[in-house]
Amino acid sequence: MKHIVLSNYRCGTTWYCESLAKQENCENFDEFIHEQCSYNQKVKNLSYFITTKNVVGKVFPYHISNLEPAGHHSTCRKIFDEILGLSKLTIIKRKDTDAQIKSYVVAKLLGRSNKAGWHDEFDEEVTIHCAKGVYEEYANFITDQNAQLEKIIKHYEHEIVYYEDFASDELRYNRPVKLHITD
């Protein structure tokens, strides 16, 4: 079974894909076309995904919009479109966009300050100060990516799963963080 989890940042996709891979006894190929992958690595990863029988991978709209660097042909896009046609497609969304934005801001700022990684947990409370303009930039990015997700899913048969319906308190990251938005 090929399975694509199409979502946006901070929607529980890491846990969801890990669980799905265990449940279906398949390989978890994670963010196989991540924006930090080189073009050649994306081609290699897409080719691997399409030739692997039992695999799950997650993709965000930002990954899709960055498939092809300027000057390259549509090799990655053609393979990706073929993968979408051959895969079960699950869309993961959040009902609470404000919580999604806050989670994204916290993850970005914790990573930039080297206080914690994208998926790290910790017990001691951390206070983060975020300039209003930076917060708005991140909020606009998440909002735009959610809109892009809506455009993409119109073209494919899919199942929608909501983060709030599967992410119990035990599954959520333990991150006691106070976020202060400053002018």
Predicted regions and their residues:
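PAPS-dependent sulfotransferase catalytic domain
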Residues: P61-E159, Y163-I181
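PAPS-dependent sulfotransferase catalytic core
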Residues: M1-N54, V59
